[in-house]
């Protein structure tokens, strides 16, 4: 079963982090992604740039509306996603617990409903 691990955490100003903290974070995520890959459960992984680089788009009454910043103004920001292919929710929970972001934010687990592969939508359940 495919699960998305959605990473949410407060985004500190990069200037408040030491070089050592940044390197520790990169190393932790590298080790985590490597463990997922070595276990054969990693579909893909993306860590997003900060919310300062976000742009939100909507179409209201046929008119394009573009806004700087994220869609929602929340304390925690959506910061990344890991797509896993594991046996069940318990396996996804075990991997979410090991995610470095779980130590300073939240890892939301959501099962995939459908995916687009080879030109067609396919059920993932």
Where are these regions (language model features)?
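Conserved, structured core segments of small domains
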Residues: 1-125
């Amino acid at each position: 079963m495919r699960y998305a691990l959605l990473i949410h955490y407060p985004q500190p100003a990069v200037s408040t982090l030491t070089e050592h903290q940044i390197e520790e974070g990169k190393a932790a995520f590298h080790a985590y992604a490597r463990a997922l890959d070595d276990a054969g459960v990693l579909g893909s992984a993306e860590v997003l740039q900060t919310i300062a680089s976000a742009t939100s788009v909507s179409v209201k009454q046929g008119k394009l509306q573009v806004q700087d910043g994220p869609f929602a103004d929340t304390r925690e920001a959506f910061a990344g996603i890991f797509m896993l292919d594991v046996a069940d929710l318990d396996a996804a929970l075990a991997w979410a617990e090991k995610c470095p972001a779980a130590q300073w934010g939240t890892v939301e687990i959501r099962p995939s409903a459908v995916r687009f592969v080879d030109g067609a939508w396919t059920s993932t359940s």
